[in-house]
Design a protein with these regions (language model features):
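Catalytic loop of short-chain dehydrogenase/reductase
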Residues: 122-124, 154-227, 239
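C-terminal helical subdomain
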Residues: 140, 199, 206-207, 212-215, ...
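Rossmann-fold cofactor-recognition segment
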Residues: 78-96
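Short, small/polar-rich loop/turn modules that mediate ligand/substrate recognition or access, typified
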Residues: 226, 231, 286-288
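Conserved glycine-rich cofactor-binding loop
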Residues: 44-45
Length: 312
């Protein structure tokens, strides 16, 4: 991943009456002069941008991505919706880059929520790239959030239904705690777990393991986050009709939707509504859990497995 980083982010500000009212609404939540800020990683992608359209109604937005062209396009879309966005070119695998992202967000107001959608699919790179982006990126974003956020803030991490498909014996869960102690040892352990898999399936396996890690992190760290008055949740989407989701259509996701009688692919907007709810005050008691939103694929798989065993 290219480590593009700009100390001076592109600021997109609006001077329209509707935008002013929305900024005033954001300030009123925390009192006079205070702005409620939402950070969305992968904010230029399908689910990230869809979430920004919702959260931006009453939050100042900070979007990050590694592609400036996508950020600029997202900013233009939000501007047309009378929403204010600050865009930051940030590599989530780089802790310093993530720290700078949160510094920028804190400079705009109080960080109330983080929606961590940044990630890559198996078709986008080799196993190490997939693991580093999805797992190490999650640690970086969450640990900086934990260190810098105030009581009442919430974060939602995007996992995947793929994390629910791996047999437990194939998940290197004993290696997961290393992510909080020794990044090099953690990545080495993850590589060792992936290496026995044939090359053609290694990225897919790394993806499932990396998303299993996201689930593990979001549940195992809940007590620690509770200690600072913070909430942490993960959501496991199924096959979603986005640019990244469609990359996997030929690799099996499309066939899976058909095989398990799911009537259609999920929509980015449907995932976004759930993400926005998870970090909202309405979900103030929700933490330390994973929400599977897959159109029933995993339920069908488990029932078919049960029936097959019963009839064997």
């Amino acid at each position: 991943m290219h480590r593009w980083f700009h100390n001076r982010p592109r600021m997109v500000s609006l001077h329209l009456r509707k935008g002013s009212r929305r900024r005033a609404a954001a300030r009123s939540i925390y009192g006079p002069g205070m702005t409620r800020v939402s950070v969305i990683t992968g904010g230029a992608g399908g689910m990230g941008l869809a979430t920004a359209r919702i959260v931006g109604r009453d939050h100042a937005l900070v979007l990050c991505d590694v592609r400036q062209d996508r950020l600029d396009a997202a900013a233009a879309i939000l501007k047309d919706l009378d929403m204010t966005a600050t865009v930051v070119n940030c590599d989530v695998t780089d802790r310093q880059s993530v720290t700078r992202l949160f510094e920028i967000a804190a400079g705009l107001g109080t960080v109330a929520s983080v929606i961590h959608t940044a990630g890559v699919s198996p078709s986008m790179g080799d196993a190490d790239y997939v693991m580093r982006t999805n797992a190490v990126g999650t640690v970086n974003v969450n640990e900086v959030f934990f260190r810098t956020s105030v009581e009442g803030a919430a974060i939602v991490n995007v996992a995947s239904m793929a994390a629910h498909m791996l047999p437990e014996e194939l998940i290197p869960a004993s290696q997961f705690p290393l992510a909080l102690q020794d990044e090099a040892a953690f990545t080495a352990g993850m590589s060792s777990a992936c290496n026995p898999i044939p090359v053609e399936g290694r990225s897919g396996f790394a993806y499932a393991v990396s998303k299993s890690f996201v689930r593990w992190y979001s549940t195992s760290q809940a007590e620690r986050f509770n200690g600072r008055g913070l909430r942490i949740v993960s959501v496991s989407p199924g096959s979603v009709d986005t640019e990244m989701g469609k990359l996997e259509e030929q690799a099996g996701a499309g066939a899976m939707v058909a095989d398990f009688a799911v009537p259609r692919w999920g929509k980015a907007e449907e995932m976004a509504e759930l993400f926005a709810f998870c970090v909202s005050d309405k979900a103030g008691y929700l933490t330390g859990t994973d929400i599977l939103n897959d159109g029933g694929v995993i339920a069908s798989m488990r029932e078919r497995t049960r029936l097959a065993a019963e009839n064997a």
